[in-house]
A protein has these predicted regions:
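Acidic-basic catalytic patches of nuclease active cores, encompassing PD-(D/E)XK
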Residues: 40, 72-101
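Flexible glycine-rich surface loops and low-complexity tracts that mediate binding to linear polymers
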Residues: 44-56, 205-206
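Beta-strand/loop nucleic-acid-binding surfaces
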Residues: 27-41
């Protein structure tokens, strides 16, 4: 996945979930943050950030904040739309007969439905931007929706689908993701239930480029 044009900046502050103030070449710009999560461990005053430049003259903000440099870790892509985009590209190379995004199942919309021959597959995508002590954690904010998705995947697996949840690790040097039970206590048991039902847990390791995000390795959880 590539961004059209990238500019560099220095993060100043974040008045609310949707916007931030960033120093771009000495000018304070109001930018859109492409992640409504807290990201408090990432968006620290003085942190280097990368901004996607918009070509839409009707927008209120010229830039989207898509990546931030974390000390001792490197660049973290924090664009919440990026995981589904890179997984869509990745799936297109996996020899499925059919790949369909946003598939309705039960009371949820699962990110991807695939077919290969007579077999049907479901894949739910989760982006990971939270790192503590060299380990990735999900979620970084409360998500009842994420818990519901795991229950739906377990049910679908029992019904004959082949199901997986894929954690897209949006930073380099991290190879596994663990449940952040401190933020969402139910997520850990729901993930364990899904695994017990046969749902695969995938860790998708990424290369974070200046203007790109690319899946480079798949590991089993």
């Amino acid at each position: 996945m590539k961004y059209r044009e990238i500019a560099d900046g220095i993060f100043l502050d974040r008045p609310n979930r949707f916007i931030a103030h960033v120093d771009v070449n000495g000018t304070v710009e109001t930018v859109h943050v492409k992640n409504t999560g807290r990201c408090r461990e990432l968006l620290l005053p003085g942190a280097a950030v990368r901004l996607e430049v918009s070509d839409n003259p009707k927008r209120k903000t010229k830039y989207d904040l898509v990546a931030v440099r974390k000390q001792e870790l490197g660049w973290v892509n924090m664009d919440s739309q990026a995981p589904n985009k890179v997984v869509g590209e990745w799936l297109s190379k996996q020899n499925f007969d059919l790949v369909r995004p946003e598939f309705a199942y039960g009371r949820s919309r699962i990110d991807f439905y695939m077919e290969k021959g007579e077999q049907k597959y479901l894949l739910e995508v989760k982006g990971c931007t939270l790192e503590v002590g060299g380990i990735g954690y999900f979620p970084d904010a409360p998500t009842e929706r994420g818990v519901k998705h795991l229950h739906e995947l377990a049910q679908a697996q029992r019904a004959g689908y082949r199901c997986a949840v894929a954690f897209v690790i949006q930073m380099e040097g991290i190879t596994e993701v663990r449940p952040n039970v401190g933020t969402q206590p139910e997520f850990g048991p729901a993930l364990a239930e899904a695994k017990a039902a046969g749902v695969r847990v995938l860790f998708l390791l990424c290369h974070v480029g200046r203007d790109s995000l690319e899946i480079v390795e798949q590991r089993e959880g």
